[in-house]
Amino acid sequence: RSHLYAEPDVKRPTAGTISISARVKVVDVSGSFCRIATGHWVHSRHLICLEYGTQDIVGTAIKFIGVPYLWGGRSAEGVDCSSLVQIALAMAGVSVPRDSDLQESAVGVEVPMDDGGDYSRIKEGDFVFFPGHVGLFMDDWRFLHANAFDMQVSLHGFSDVLDRSRSENAGVTSIRRLTSSARSSRHD
């Protein structure tokens, strides 16, 4: 989230906020501030050109650790599992649907796994889908997701997440990996 200012000066009162991945049009520049089409000023360090974005999807998602879980939320005030994925991908210039079931068929390519739960092909940054849920696989067998269990974005041991999902008769439905071609298909 970033503050909006009525003038290009951090010592002036704020005029509101914008959320991460908000699309804005820069119409003027003054020092380290950019005026956006609404007339407000935003510090330039809080803006990323859509043409370049960020390739660090995991890094973007990690910034949300501790943000409250809010079903349907899509800001630092609260996120759900699919909006966490949608925001992280949007910052990389990749547009995906809002809901996890639609993301499952739209994100990257499927990573093969056998019925016995062989996850040897999984890598950091892969998207792991369950019925109605999605998160990011991290290094050291950790799983990053917005969840109603902790009521926040948190890291869990991947084995613990698998055990909990199996106890609810809801195992992994697929693992998806973003390809380099998906990363290069930017927003318009």
For each feature predicted by the language model, list its residue ranges.
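Boundary regions of SH3-family modules and the immediately adjacent low-complexity/disordered segments
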Residues: 1-3, 7-9, 14-67
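Surface-exposed interaction/gating patches
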Residues: 25, 83-86, 117
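Short peripheral tails and domain-boundary helices/loops at the edges of structured domains
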Residues: 42-59, 144-171
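Active-site nucleophilic cysteine motif
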Residues: 61, 73-92
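Surface-exposed patches in mature extracellular/periplasmic domains of secreted proteins
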Residues: 69-73, 98-99
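...with weaker cross-activation on analogous glycine-rich loops/strands in unrelated enzymes
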Residues: 94-160
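Low-complexity, Gly/Ser/Thr/Pro-rich intrinsically disordered linker/tail segments
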Residues: 162-188
